Amino acid sequence: IKLFENQDNFNNTMSRLSAERSSILHKQDQHFFANKNNIKIWHSELKSMIVNFDMAFKHYCEATGARTAFDVDNFHYTSLKIQKTLPTEGYHVWHIEHGKGYENEARALVFSIYLNDVEDGGETEFLHFSKRVKPKTGRIVIWPASFPYVHRGNPPLSGEKYILTSWMMLKP
């Protein structure tokens, strides 16, 4: 959260009504990307989250059979998107992370790490599974980037929500 508060270069958001009336490609959060150009700045703060993610990813591959379907060594991370969502805002549109015609066509898996607890609302909701994942500090959620994992970020109703999201790509 301190990383976000000290970040000067983040993208601003729209109001909830403006976003609902706009193109579905517009987001209603504030975010910045930690990538190869600036990761050294964030490395010490993000290192423990990435170590925890690596353990969760190995568990995910074992539990789902992804280890036999894919060579796990063929996965690599993309940029880390760190988001701040204000109360009653967020990206409420049902979507998948693997859309035709976008740069994300090679996305295989999505992962999110919740950076704070949200008492009311703020869940990641999966349409076809009737499942809502409540934000808890350090909780890691991993899912396939394509159908049927249609999902949305529900608005936090009490307090702000901080989340780190990234994508696992398959090396060509």
Each model region followed by its residue ranges:
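Fe(II)/2-oxoglutarate oxygenase catalytic core
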Residues: 1-140, 148-172
